[in-house]
Curated annotation (Swiss-Prot):
GO terms for cellular component: periplasmic space. This is Cytochrome subunit of sulfide dehydrogenase. Disulfide bonds: none annotated. GO terms for molecular function: electron transfer activity; heme binding; metal ion binding. Binds 1 heme c group covalently per subunit. Monoheme cytochrome that function as the electron transport subunit of sulfide dehydrogenase.
Length: 110
């Protein structure tokens, strides 16, 4: 048994113990989940929802309006070329979070 002791200690399976492992530093999340999800919208609608092209602006629209539009795109009751495909990729909860984020931007900027 004594001959095996150095092997056990070297492998970490011996009697020697150390303190608890240090926890890695965690960077706090500063963005909301809705803000993170909205990043895929920014390419067409702008980072703040205020489009500078022929794509409709969603800045200033209510969360309810945006959520209803996304749900309608998702279920096909509102026709589109691209939005239906995007909306189908989101859960109902994610659609709600995106709508809340964009719908409340104009309130934050005043």
């Amino acid at each position: 048994m004594l001959a095996a002791a150095p092997l056990l200690l070297a492998s970490g399976n011996g009697f020697a113990t150390t303190g608890p492992a240090a926890k890695p530093a965690v960077k706090p999340v500063t963005e909301s989940r809705g803000e993170i999800l909205s990043l895929s919208c920014a390419g067409c609608h702008g980072t703040d929802g205020n489009s500078s092209s022929v794509i409709p602006s969603i800045y200033g629209k209510s969360p309810e309006y945006i959520e209803t539009a996304l749900i309608d795109f998702k279920n096909g009751s509102r026709t589109s070329t691209v939005m239906g495909r995007h909306a189908k990729g989101y859960t109902g909860e994610e659609i709600h979070l995106i709508a809340e984020y964009f719908g409340n931007l104009s309130k934050k900027n005043h």
